[in-house]
Amino acid sequence: MRDVSITLQIENWAQRTFESQDGSSRVVRSGDVMDPTGRCRLTAWCDFDPTPGDSIRIEGGRVQFWQGSPDLVIDSLEQVSSLSDSPWEKIDPENHWVEVGLTEITQGGSRRGISTSGTIVAINSGSGIIERCPECRRMLRDGSCTEHGAQRGVEDLRLRFVLDDGVSNANLFLGKESAEEFLGMKMDKIKSEISSIGKEVFVSNLRRRVLARKMAVHGRCAVDGQGAMLFADKVELVESKPAEEAEMVMQKWEVVL
């Protein structure tokens, strides 16, 4: 998609230098941007260095996909300008999540900065300490990467659940930081606990804690031919209110007692 015009607020910004295929050094700048409808990544192939919190206007930008999510790209400074006044009240990045129903997520495209909820209906037995390929970060299976063969893996922490809203479901992944926050323990302590009680007991304890519980999720989603995946920045268990939930079901299905 080309000729994109949009107003955005900068959340963060960084640059990195890399070696291109012809051997020359190139600089790419990128960061997270947002507006009241959500957030995405912005990549600049030009000397553009905004400050977090700045409001900008893009004219003639383009969209590309990175890790399944649409990202904005500008190729020259002529495509972007700084705004002295924001068209909306300053957005707080820590609390900026767009509420989207789980079924809507599964039927839509990949996006960032979303908040959704559902019931945990399954816990993957591979949850806990895993090993990743040092080359591509894929999860190793029996010490082997599907892309790079046998590898000495790098340990990581991952929890994997299935979230369901009664109509649709999605795989939910908690990476190291979000898993540590949810479990209330650092990775080293979790590793020690698994070594002490065993992987099966660890997963069993996790099932007792979350299975059939409602969970609120904040993060990003990726949707492809294999279904929907949620990658959580943070999660929290939601205390159920049976009377209110029963009333909602009765209203939805027009039940009269």
Predicted regions and their residues:
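Single-stranded nucleic acid-binding proteins centered on OB/S1-type folds
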Residues: M1-L257
